[in-house]
Regions:
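Sec-dependent bacterial lipoprotein signal peptides
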Residues: 1-18
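Extracytoplasmic copper-binding redox domains, predominantly the cupredoxin/blue-copper superfamily
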Residues: 19-131
Length: 131
């Protein structure tokens, strides 16, 4: 009887852990990086989270010389995303699997609309203003 109670207790703990653990940040992505709407590391480093087939935030303003890092915060097993400027040649990340990152430093001011190549038709678009 005592052994049965120990087994049931262990199973209950495992179920509770599985149900209440935080799985939202994807493998390798830190919880701080995946905060929505944006994480500002310091005045020159910004994080944009890719989650639920959207950029968070979908519009961001940064100073000239700032670095923006896009982090795929989807759960493991969800499709990969890109961050690609609407103007060819400015930037085009590879496919970012959950937990992956892509960074770019912006040395020229301007307005830069961008999108996710596989999910543009689903409305996965963003805008970066460098001022």
């Amino acid at each position: 009887m005592k052994r049965l109670m120990m087994v049931l207790g262990a199973v209950g703990c495992a179920i509770a852990l599985a149900c209440f653990s935080d799985r939202s940040s994807g493998p390798g992505a830190g919880a701080a990086e995946c905060r929505v709407p944006v994480t500002v590391i310091d005045s020159m480093h910004y994080i944009v989270a890719l989650r639920n087939f959207a950029f968070h935030p979908d519009s961001i303003a940064v100073p000239v010389g700032a670095t923006v890092t896009w982090v795929n915060c989807e759960d493991a097993g969800v499709e990969a995303h890109t961050t690609t400027s609407d103007t060819t040649g400015i930037w085009d990340s590879p496919l970012l699997i959950p937990g992956a990152r892509f960074s770019r430093r912006f040395s020229t001011g301007g307005v830069y609309p961008y999108h996710c190549i596989p999910h543009r038709d689903l409305g996965m678009v963003g805008k970066l203003v460098v001022q």
